[in-house]
Regions:
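Conserved beta-strand-loop surface patch within small alpha/beta domains used
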Residues: 1-117, 126-181
Length: 181
């Protein structure tokens, strides 16, 4: 057998590279966090999620495309949410969401260089922003890398919560930074 080195599918960038992607002021702000995980999200990505979720009283969701930046240690990172990819092929109710596989194809087609699926979003209309047991199983099965982030939004109660990694560890909302493009 011949061993051949191959670049990984997902490129983890160095933390200072975020300045090139989001500008000096926002980049420095994101680098100043002392917490393990910081989520930086463009206003446009937030709007894309909300435009998909708000008209509905059933669970809606999709994938998020962005970039990942490594910090000091392997379990410290900054995740940049750039684009929300709504799941159009889905089956949903007020308390459940089953996304079809087409959303993955759509996400891959809409990813630029160094952009990958970094997580997912979904709504809990008027149920509160929390990760249910099903959400935790989905995170562990489909978004198990340390940098994968799940965001749940209750647009009726105006709440959101953010979780990362296979163990669905909650990120304090103070570590979520929304930026202009």
């Amino acid at each position: 057998m011949l061993w051949k080195n191959q670049e990984p599918d997902i490129k983890i960038l160095k933390d200072y590279e975020i300045i090139n992607d989001i500008g000096f002021k926002a980049g420095v702000h994101s680098l100043q966090s002392n917490d393990k995980v910081t989520l930086v999200m463009t206003k446009n990505c937030w709007k894309q999620m909300m435009n998909h979720i708000e008209p509905h009283k059933v669970e809606m969701g999709g994938l998020v495309v962005g970039k990942v930046y490594k910090r000091k240690t392997p379990d410290e990172f900054i995740c940049l949410f750039l684009k929300a990819i709504p799941a159009i092929d889905k089956d949903s109710s007020p308390v459940s969401l089953l996304m079809g596989t087409e959303v993955w194809n759509h996400a891959n087609k809409n990813s630029l260089e160094n952009e990958v699926v970094v997580g997912w979003f979904h709504s809990h209309p008027n149920l509160g922003a929390f990760f249910s047991g099903t959400d935790r199983m989905n995170q562990q099965a489909n978004f198990s890398s340390q940098f994968h982030i799940g965001i749940v939004i209750d647009h009726i109660r105006d709440e959101y919560a953010v979780f990362y990694g296979k163990d669905s560890i909650q990120i304090d909302n103070k570590n979520v930074i929304v930026i202009e493009e």
